[in-house]
């Protein structure tokens, strides 16, 4: 089961025309099985897995491949992740903004190093609106 407000958040972002992608260290089959099981596949414009890059986060390669596929620059994006040492570090090293998913299993993380810490995924909609001057 997905975390609370995941569908609501992804739907709001997709309706706003926000491009969405997944960067996963999992093999392609495993990543896609999770996405299909959670019925989230229709929200994502790109899914980059270990099979696509041969490198795991925090390597820059999976993040850059995702950005290239989406046609975006790092400063135009926010990466949401639950593992600061891989997700936040990897995204920040190429200039992406970052949000730490505190609503997941944080493994006792106190200081994520992210630009934002999210207690609820729906906070992302508010952050994106603020970043784009909508609110």
What role is predicted for each listed range?
Residues 7, 11-14, 18-135:
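Asp-based, Mg2+/Mn2+-dependent phosphohydrolase catalytic module
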């Amino acid at each position: 089961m997905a975390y609370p407000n995941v569908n609501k958040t992804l739907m709001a972002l997709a309706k706003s025309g926000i491009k969405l992608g997944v960067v996963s260290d999992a093999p392609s089959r495993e990543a896609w099985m999770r996405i299909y099981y959670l019925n989230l596949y229709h929200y994502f414009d790109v899914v980059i897995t270990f099979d696509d890059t041969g490198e795991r986060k925090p390597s820059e390669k999976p993040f850059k491949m995702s950005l290239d596929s989406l046609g975006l620059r790092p400063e135009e994006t926010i990466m949401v992740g639950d593992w600061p040492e891989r997700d936040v570090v990897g995204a920040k090293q190429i200039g992406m903004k970052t949000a730490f998913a505190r609503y997941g299993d944080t493994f006792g993380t106190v200081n994520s190093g992210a630009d934002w810490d999210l207690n609820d995924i729906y906070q992302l909609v508010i952050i994106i609106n603020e970043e784009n001057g909508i609110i």
